[in-house]
Amino acid sequence: MGEGGAQRPLLTVIAGPTASGKTALAIALAQRAGGEIVSADSQQVYRHFDIGTAKPSSEELAAVPHHLVSAVDPMEAFSAVEYQRRADAVIAEIAARGRPVFVVGGTGLYLRVLLHGVLEAPGALPELRAELEALAAGEGREAVHRRLAEVDPETAAKLPPQDLVRVIRALEIHAQTGVPASAFRKAHAFAPDRYPFQLYVLSPPRDVLYGLINTRTRMLFERGLVEETRELLARGYADSAPMRSVGYVQARAVVEGRMTREEAIHDTAQETRRYAKRQLTWFRKEPGAVFLAPPYEAALPLGGCCSP
């Protein structure tokens, strides 16, 4: 499923949409194989943002060594290129210990840069484009530009509101990759297939996945997402990248009195379902991906996973 240099370790990659069960499967497999986990999640990489990013619990982190979780200050710029650099270093250390490497996450851009290095620009999203064009027609191009500024202030600072085509394009890239267009474009091309790898994409039935997302969203709010957000805002993280992610945007609206708690839960679940759909669309384009339906461990090819 991927060919790399002879000295590069085999990576077992567990990918898939949010709430699909990646963490639980990866921990079970890593425990069985005596391996370590490298996260490929563009939000869990930040410190302090714990509840809203659904980080592994303290028990899960203790069960198997995890890397690139809570590794970056929230105010630090962290691109796909930087992720690749840090992941390469961690993978080399794990391999030097003679332990299997499991890469786990739903940020498709991180995985593509790590495995292949080659970034293909994502295609258009007709529904999103139509929505944004309607917003521009109804409320002005500045309204679309403000939406870009919320998720990608760096690109927004470089584009005037009048450049609607490029503003919409930047929002399309963010919608499909989960990272700002500025970070996407900073990533450089490298030789494809940088590691030998086995890529498994968790793909539960849509109704099951959406049910899991709805349940987890409510659980995150019950665990204190609004309170965590209030504390993070007080600590000065209002302008940080993770504060612009789904869940924190809505929780902040509750803190600031712009949404009720139930409205925030509903909106977070809705936006998360949309993101999960885009994640699956992304992974369907990945060469060599093996899609698994639950129960995942039973669906794994015999002898095809997790060799030291």
From Swiss-Prot:
A GO BP annotation: tRNA modification
Main enzyme class: transferase
Gene name linked to the record: miaA
Protein name (database record): tRNA dimethylallyltransferase
InterPro entries listed in its UniProt record: Dimethylallyltransferase, IPT, P-loop_NTPase
Native species: Myxococcus xanthus (strain DK1622)
NCBIfam families noted in UniProt: miaA
Role of this protein: Catalyzes the transfer of a dimethylallyl group onto the adenine at position 37 in tRNAs that read codons beginning with uridine, leading to the formation of N6-(dimethylallyl)adenosine (i(6)A).
Pfam family, one: IPPT
Interaction with substrate tRNA as annotated region, ranges: 41-44
